[in-house]
Curated annotation (Swiss-Prot):
Keyword rRNA-binding appears in the UniProt entry: no
Gene Ontology CC: cytoplasm; cytoplasmic side of plasma membrane; cytosol; sarcolemma; synapse
CDD domains xrefs: LMWPTP (cd16343)
Gene: Acp1
EC category name: hydrolase
EC number: 3.1.3.48, 3.1.3.2
Family affiliation: Belongs to the low molecular weight phosphotyrosine protein phosphatase family.
Protein name: Low molecular weight phosphotyrosine protein phosphatase
Amino acid sequence: MAEVGSKSVLFVCLGNICRSPIAEAVFRKLVTDENVSDNWRIDSAATSTYEVGNPPDYRGQNCMKKHGIHMQHIARQITREDFATFDYILCMDESNLRDLNRKSNQVKNCKAKIELLGSYDPQKQLIIEDPYYGNDSDFEVVYQQCLRCCKAFLEKTH
């Protein structure tokens, strides 16, 4: 559910059920804790149609619950409008980045800055690996990476 604000960020992964909804929920919590949530429009999306209409992966939801973060999202695919209306589109891996750059080239009024979320990681882990075929500890790794990256992104754009 996108929020209205003066800045906007869209988190993107392949299916929009693991990494990007975790990043979205983490960032929502950070901006809420900083009392700047009114300044942000935040959402997440997929490059593919594989999981459209599905809730986040239960393992990701369990991981977020453990950290006291609520997740409320239904998977959707990125749209042409997203490229024109979001300031930042932050994705998880090189495949996402290639797909997004290819799609953005088909949008005349693309204003979004498309980057890897991992480019903000102070620990320099550029890629946020897909935990879909992994276990609970893989989801924890994704959470920790998203937390570090989202904090750094917020500091840079705040």
